[in-house]
Structures are given as structure tokens and as C-alpha cells.
């Protein structure tokens, strides 16, 4: 039986990881949630206990040590990811400090395996294909603090003989997505018969359904593979074609308005991941 503690369990990615793990045998789940979300896991079979916090990133190392008793695996998903604000928010620093306290507590505990969540934005995005050995070159506070956590925990857990996995997520979409994100925004606009104002759409991205990403994360949490993992589709597609696929389901290609928004400054032309983990 594997006792798994999960942070960020109610979020976009975390909820799907919870659902994926809840379908597996020999798993006990211990999600950490904010106090106001007490009843969210009522229908989950594998949830054995729920830990509550007002602010996970302000908890002390001693608080974490108590929560880690009898835990075998930690999946750390929690982070500040408010749409439109997270990339250069100073709250990334709080997330880094809080995550390092968790890491220190894990290093001193009986936990065997730690899965952290990173981002494709850690890489040098001038490269055409992004492999786990592609040079890192983070450009914003979000990716910089993620790299800082990755490099710190990688060394710490090597010293302490803990298994460490770092899952770099690419462009996820699907259930529970913030309605301001690309896929959810297009769905919302077309459902209401409204135009979806988009950029040129020429950018190439590696999109993956969050459910598929969650399956990869849940599977690797119970695996023996260690190190950095790209969680991606390996199927690059232009934003224009991605949007057109969604619009085709509604029969409303006419509502896609490309070029109505400016492309983001310094936005990469291509973000294309190469998997290094057997998704099956």
C-alpha cells in the first residue's frame, strides 16, 4: 500500500491527478486543501485523510514533518498560477520558500519518493525540440523559481537518497481550466455564439489534455524512474489549427477572429516537447 500526500489537490492539474490515483489499487491519498474546501473529496474512495491549511506556503517545516508521518510518496503540485499574473508575481518567491521547507521536511522523513511539477518555460525556448537535456534558460519569475526548486531538491534528495522526479508540463487544456485560458476561452465564446478574439495563431505549441497529463503524473509517482520528465504530447500544432479543431465541433469557424490580439512580446515561435517516459 502506498500512502501519497498531494499538494494543490483541488487545482486544475491536482484534481485530475487525484481522480487518476483514485482509480488505482493499493493507494491511500492524503490531499492538503484550504479549509474552505472541506467536502470536495466526499466521493473519492482512496482518500484516507484530508489535511487543511490556510496557506500551504507559510507552513513551517515542523508542520510538514507531522503531515509526512507514514507517507511514502509526495506529489507537490501547489503553486501560484493565477492567469495573467503568475509569470512575474513576487508570490513565486513565497512558493519557492514554502516548497523548500517542504523539501527539507521530506529529506528528514521516511518519504521515499518526491514528484515535483515544473514547466516547459524552464527551457531555452529558442531550441526547436525540447528534450530534458535541453539547456535551461528561464526568463520570468515563475520559471526561474521552478528551476531554483528543481536544482535545489535534485541535489538535496541525491544526498539524502530519496527518489526525485520533476515533471515539466507543457500546454495543458481540459476540465477545470480557467475560462481565460485559450481552450476554455474559445469554448465559452462559441457556446454563447460570440466571437473569439485571438492572436495571429501562427505560434506552434505542444498541447496535451490535462487528464492525459494526470495519468502520466500518477503513473510515474508509482514508478521507479527518476529525474526530469517532459509531460507533453509530442504533437506540435499551430494555435490556429488548435482553435479551428474546437470551432469545428460547434460548426462556428466564422467566430474565430485571428489577429485581433497582439502576440505576446518575446513569445517563442515553437514550443515542442519530446517525451522521455513511456506514457502507456
Give residue spans per PLM region.
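Conserved Rossmann-fold NAD(P)-dependent oxidoreductase catalytic core, especially the SDR/UDP-sugar
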Residues: 76, 100-141
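Conserved glycine-rich Rossmann-like NAD(P)H-binding loop of the short-chain dehydrogenase/reductase
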Residues: 26-37
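C-terminal substrate-binding subdomain of Rossmann-fold SDR/epimerase-dehydratase oxidoreductases
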Residues: 190-280
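NAD(P)-dependent short-chain dehydrogenase/reductase
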Residues: 151-205, 210-214, 245-247
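N-terminal Rossmann NAD(P)H-binding glycine-rich loop of SDR-like oxidoreductase domains
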Residues: 4-24
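Active-site helix of classical SDR
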Residues: 95, 141, 145-148
